[in-house]
């Protein structure tokens, strides 16, 4: 388990964040996960599964469609990188920002209730890493992420079970957008 390799301070912060999400979830549906045990596996370990790729870049990162703050919050805590988390649902973005403020993480993580297309018009190619977990189809999320990446930036897509056709279409779109797949790995949690 990746979580167990982190230092104690980082583990405590990530667990505290997960506990806040589970509590907030009682009033605002941020996730379908309702227990710490499931959250540790399906949110924390899943979020941290790309930590090696995530730490290969410096500079700010962007989490598209952050929902309850996954994978952005665990990755920021684990890596120490600064980032922006966006979600088009304002209530979710406000809730995640409140939890980040409560844990005194607002110096490293900013949350915005905005769509990626709007953010791209506002800031352009700003982020060294763009990450998306369970957001839209692979071709669509590639088109959303590319305008936000600096040259030689990195896009990380955390996907569930993807059919072969969707992967082929994603590779076709990536090539059109001037992107290159560096690596792919399959995890079974």
PLM region spans:
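Class I SAM-dependent transferase core
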Residues: 1-58, 62, 91, 98-107
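Residues at secondary-structure transition points
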Residues: 35, 71-73
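Ubiquitous "structural anchor" signal
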Residues: 37, 55, 77-80, 153
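Class I SAM-dependent methyltransferase "Motif I" SAM/SAH-binding loop
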Residues: 65-68
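S-adenosylmethionine
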Residues: 74, 81-84, 88-189
């Amino acid at each position: 388990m990746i979580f167990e390799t982190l230092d104690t301070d980082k583990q405590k912060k990530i667990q505290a964040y997960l506990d806040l999400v589970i509590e907030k979830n009682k009033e605002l549906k941020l996730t379908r996960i309702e227990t710490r045990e499931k959250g540790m596996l399906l949110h924390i370990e899943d979020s941290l599964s790309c930590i090696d790729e995530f730490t290969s870049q410096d500079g700010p990162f962007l989490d598209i469609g952050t929902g309850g703050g996954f994978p952005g919050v665990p990755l920021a805590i684990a890596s120490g990188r600064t980032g922006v988390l966006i979600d088009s649902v304002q209530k979710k973005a406000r809730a995640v920002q409140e939890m980040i403020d409560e844990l005194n993480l607002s110096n490293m993580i900013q949350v915005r209730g905005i769509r990626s297309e709007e953010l791209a018009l506002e800031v352009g190619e700003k982020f060294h890493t763009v990450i998306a977990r369970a957001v839209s189809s692979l071709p669509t999320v590639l088109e959303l992420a590319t305008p936000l990446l600096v040259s030689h930036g990195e896009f990380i897509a955390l996907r569930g079970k993807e059919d072969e056709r969707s992967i082929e279409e994603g590779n076709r779109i990536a090539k059109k957008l001037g992107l290159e797949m560096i690596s792919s790995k399959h995890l079974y949690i």
